[in-house]
């Protein structure tokens, strides 16, 4: 389902709220929501440190919640909104979950799996391709990451 820019902005703001939860826990602040028919069916935020599990990325949490909501591993007719470009692992999971549309805020130059380093979501060699849109609220999404890294440097300096 195509969403207007106003609707897309609302959903990305919801993803930013999820990222803020991670920031409050000193986790890398990435947030994600999955939307179907205008309703958020999955939410997630980074929780690797808290859970001691490497796979507890925002997208993975949101996919798990959306799978439970739908009672199906296939998340057809959904859109995933995430504050930072999905990493390689999350891009693979997005494809496996059959999510057809991803909208992200800021690029991930270090480990991006959608555009920056790898193009997993659009690779024609794979059996599922995803429509990718980038740059929605990019400055806001980048700013929360910059805040996290600035706070980390301050903690190191003061310890």
From Swiss-Prot:
Belongs to the cytidine and deoxycytidylate deaminase family. InterPro entries: APOBEC/CMP_deaminase_Zn-bd (IPR016192), CMP_dCMP_dom (IPR002125), Cytidine_deaminase-like (IPR016193), tRNA_aden_deaminase (IPR028883). It catalyses: adenosine(34) in tRNA + H2O + H(+) = inosine(34) in tRNA + NH4(+). Catalyzes the deamination of adenosine to inosine at the wobble position 34 of tRNA(Arg2). Its EC number is 3.5.4.33. The active site is at residue 59. GO terms for biological process: tRNA wobble adenosine to inosine editing. GO terms for molecular function: tRNA-specific adenosine-34 deaminase activity; zinc ion binding. This is tRNA-specific adenosine deaminase. Homodimer. CDD domains: nucleoside_deaminase. It comes from the Bacteria. Keywords: Hydrolase, Metal-binding, tRNA processing, Zinc. Its cofactor is Zn(2+). Binds 1 zinc ion per subunit. Residues 6-133 form the CMP/dCMP-type deaminase domain. Zn(2+) binds at residues 57, 87, 90.
């Amino acid at each position: 389902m195509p969403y207007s820019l106003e609707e897309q902005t609302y959903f990305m703001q919801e993803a930013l709220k999820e990222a803020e939860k991670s920031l409050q826990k000193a986790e890398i602040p990435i947030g994600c929501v999955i939307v179907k028919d205008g309703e958020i069916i999955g939410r997630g935020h980074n929780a690797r440190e808290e859970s001691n599990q490497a796979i507890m990325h925002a997208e993975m949490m949101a996919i798990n919640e959306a799978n439970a909501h739908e009672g199906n591993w296939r998340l057809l007719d959904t859109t995933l909104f995430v504050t930072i470009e999905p990493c390689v692992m999350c891009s693979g999971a997005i494809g496996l979950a059959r999510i057809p549309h991803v909208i992200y805020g800021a690029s991930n130059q270090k480990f991006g799996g959608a555009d920056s380093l790898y193009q997993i979501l659009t690779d024609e060699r794979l059996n599922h391709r995803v429509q990718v849109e980038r740059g929605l609220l990019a400055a806001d999404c980048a700013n929360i990451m910059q805040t996290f890294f600035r706070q980390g440097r301050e903690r190191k300096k003061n310890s």
